[in-house]
Curated annotation (Swiss-Prot):
It comes from Drosophila melanogaster. This is Protein ecdysoneless. One of its GO terms (biological process) is Golgi organization. InterPro entries: Ecd. Required in both the follicle cells and the germline for oocyte development. Keywords: Cytoplasm, Developmental protein, Differentiation, Oogenesis. The lineage of its organism: Eukaryota, Metazoa, Ecdysozoa, Arthropoda, Hexapoda. It comes from the Eukaryota. The gene is ecd. Residues 491-501 have a biased composition (Acidic residues). GO terms for cellular component: cytoplasm; nucleus. Belongs to the ECD family.
Amino acid sequence: MSKIPGSNLEFVREEDFVEYYIFPKIPDNVQDEGALRKLMLQIRNEISAIVREKSLERSYLWHKDEFQLQVRLGGAEERLLNEETNPEEEAELGDLPPHFHGVTHYGDNISDEWFVVYLLTEITRARGDCIARVSDSDGEFLLIEAADALPDWASPETCEQRVYLVGGHLQLLQNSAASSQDKPLTMAMAVQRIRMNPTLYRCSQEIQSCIDARLKEYQIAQPHFSIHRQVLELPHSAAQLLKQKPRLLSSAVRAFCERDSLDIKALRTMRYFPPEATRVRTNVRFTRCLYAMLSHQQYLPEKRLGWHLTDPVSEPERYKEQLLGLKLASGLEILATQAKRVEGQQLEDLPAWRSYLRSLLSKGYFRDNIEGSAEYQELLNKAKVYFRGNQERFRTASRAGAEILDLLLHPAEAASEELRDEENNLQPSDSDEWLNISAEDLDSMLQDRYGPKKLYKPNGQMNAEEFTKQLAEFLDRQSNYEGIEHRGLEEPELDSDDDEPPPQANGSTGLTAKVKKNPSMRKACQRNSVIQPEEPDSTHVRNFLDFVIPEDNWDSTSEMSDYADEDDMESNLNALSGGGSVFPLDRQIQSYMEQMDRELAQTSVGKSFHGKKKTAPQADEDDFDDIEDFEPININVNTLRNMMDSYQSQVGGAGPVSNLFSAMGVGMSAVEDKEQKDISESAV
């Protein structure tokens, strides 16, 4: 598992986690640690009330871990216990101010990650003094969501630890062009900058709209659309337990879906949840993710245990209720068995504790104290308390199993009464047709989310001007190991990082720390360190698109339009010659080109170009009857027409134009391939 600066409890972390920080504003007069902790606990209670309200309004079910916050005062010993730093990383991360920290594992349900973002947005909106930061195993995933709207300077390297939520809005602290790429901005420095000017770093509306669109499903104060209600037939003890602790449902489903050979052995006896002669029917709320996981698990119980199922053909709905019920009861059985297996295990026997202790030793937590001394033992006891407390933060299988065993020993009579009342007033199960999706629906969803840009206006005509603009922008880019980049664009003047050193006079910041640590990538970068000059083909196409169209000079002897001034002519000739350095053009060649213009003007080649619309003649144009048929060439329309003709000649197959369209992010549907679109001046 890769180390992330500022990460928490690395030894229990999986890849599917989201990590978040909340920095409240602490008054200057609160200096005492006891008073500070009391204030932090009070603020946490207020934040927890907001989270509870939003979760209940939406009847939200967590897939694995819930949203939770731990108080962090930012002390050095606390950070060592929390596995946040190595001694050599202290200068990089800086001293964090008092804050709340949380980690939520979302498993297979990505909705939990975005619900965390929604909660942080609402918390910072309700409490304007709070600044929040959120990231996951991919880093700044909020910027990944808004990738199409980011400024040119934004990249994973330049934006590390620079994305924050303030007042319900996304803020991105810009990096200085003179800053070091190997040293990310510390969170303490970022929070300080935002405090100084809370609105300076607010993202553009386009970026904010990308995030708001992703959070739209959570903003309605009603049960979330992902909730699926299903009637199940369960053993009475299992149904009673789920009424007492509905959150055990997700642990049971995951345990059943992830069962191993030891778990299957436990299912052959069903010691804790035997299939009783009379089972109860009850309403159970799933998330769609959990329901899909449970439904698609292939499992048939042993009949000798007493799992009698109805005929799936004659009573399919009743069969589904029974089959899903026995799967869920089996998951609860697995959890109880796992907890019983480790019930008497000592802390020193846990692999996680041994790994945690080794980590503390390597980071100098015990200082120079001799093992067994009073100081050493005091620090060791602190570490044990801290370890146990943090283990209880997460919904591990053993913790859920221990909770099940405790509830079986102390059943609640109120839950039994609720079951009896509910059995006479069962709500019907929700339709699960959403499980079935056709290929056409999937294609439509992918097209809406990731589909290429269209060239058509709402009236069905093609936008020639937009097409040539996209083509010119695409050709004006260069490629290296990081992908296609804009060429020739100067970096904007950005805020300076006071804590970051200036660059070397002749240094380059192109190689990031990740590249330096990766030998294969470093070699690839060295091979590509010299950027090759542009290909002649792309240069010529760009020059054609940028060609200056002069005003007509009616006094010219040429039969086609001449150049209105000498500067335009020189710029066009230099453009076609590559700047005059590769193919120098003298006056004799220029005269040849002018003669060719005159000869081609009245030929089929000259007439094949699409011209611009003629405007009504003015009073002072009566003397130009001899050139009334002249139409200036429309570069945009002619470029698009030629590209479309070439595309149609490929009959939808691979070829130069379709490959260019794909690289530009431009798509042509099958229907559009067959129809002849109106490519005219009105389309521009």
